Swiss-Prot record:
Keywords for this protein: Cell projection, Chromophore, Disulfide bond, G-protein coupled receptor, Glycoprotein, Lipoprotein, Membrane, Palmitate, Phosphoprotein, Photoreceptor protein, Receptor, Retinal protein, Sensory transduction, Transducer, Transmembrane, Transmembrane helix, Vision
Name of protein: Rhodopsin
Motif range ('Ionic lock' involved in activated form stabilization): 134-136
Main location: membrane
Cytoplasmic topological intervals: 62-73, 134-152, 225-252, 309-352
GO CC, one annotated term: membrane
InterPro entries, alphabetized: GPCR_opsins, GPCR_Rhodpsn, GPCR_Rhodpsn_7TM, Opsin, Retinal_BS, Rhodopsin, Rhodopsin_N
Transmembrane portions of the chain: 37-61, 74-96, 111-133, 153-173, 203-224, 253-274, 287-308
Organism of derivation: Gobius niger
Role this protein plays: Photoreceptor required for image-forming vision at low light intensity. While most salt water fish species use retinal as chromophore, most freshwater fish use 3-dehydroretinal, or a mixture of retinal and 3-dehydroretinal. Light-induced isomerization of 11-cis to all-trans retinal triggers a conformational change that activates signaling via G-proteins. Subsequent receptor phosphorylation mediates displacement of the bound G-protein alpha subunit by arrestin and terminates signaling.
Amino acid sequence: MNGTEGPFFYIPMVNTTGVVRSPYEYPQYYLVNPAAYACLGAYMFFLILVGFPVNFLTLYVTLEHKKLRTPLNYILLNLAVADLFMVFGGFTTTIYTSMHGYFVLGRLGCNIEGFFATLGGEIALWSLVVLAIERWVVVCKPISNFRFGENHAIMGVAFTWFMASACAVPPLVGWSRYIPEGMQCSCGIDYYTRAEGFNNESFVIYMFTVHFCIPLAVVGFCYGRLLCAVKEAAAAQQESETTQRAEREVSRMVVIMVIGFLVCWLPYASVAWYIFTHQGSEFGPLFMTIPAFFAKSSSIYNPMIYICMNKQFRHCMITTLCCGKNPFEEEEGASTTKTEASSVSSSSVSPA
């Protein structure tokens, strides 16, 4: 084994020289240069500095503007709440621990940080899945005479919390566990060991299948069908410049949304699966830290893609920030043209 396993931790370094110490008790500067911990703390501070205002503004603007409080926007508020969970439950903790060079909050703190970071990330993940399903149902109309209402939106939000809890709670009660990972300043699910009594193997397989492969397949299917519907509408109305413009805009949005999903989750899931299937192989502390950066940064680019790209949200945000006036109102209004002749429009399938 090219690492050192201890009670509730795994250090990616063989203890041949006797320098390896518990990440709950001693600085881990023997793993990487102390400057790396400063960079980690600075990155977390940047995520908080940008992620908190954007997501908080989303909630505030929705409360202030009644026209935003529609069932189709409930899942976006849920996404903002999930990102705030990651900001307060994960990023603030990592700043504090990176300043010390180890997980100074102990075993209980590791469980709390790991739980909130996982819960927030999973709520965000399943919010994107529900969002894709909602757009597919509204635009492609696979169910005739179906009208999306408030009860459906609430069920969608409840579903995201149920699925997120189904991933974040088990490690607290004995099915897998939370341990320090990467540079040992943040905690995550144990992909690294086959510790007796925790059934890590079955949990990782369950998580990879249910909480990555299935969401990826659903998002791909829904946006693929949506894109086909938009292109069919555009082909049927080739003489309409409005329809052609809507088709191009929607296609661009779909591509951005799928790429954003993959950038967020593919690196982390791939590395976690590699570590799990190659336990005992040699890898450095940055091997898991860097992919985690992509997943954590979703608290910034998720609202940018799914909220700020939505014309209605963007207009209300600018109005709120500019004390009730939108200096770009003419430009915003001109770009909200909808296709009357078809059931597909850029506003109905936009990220919000």
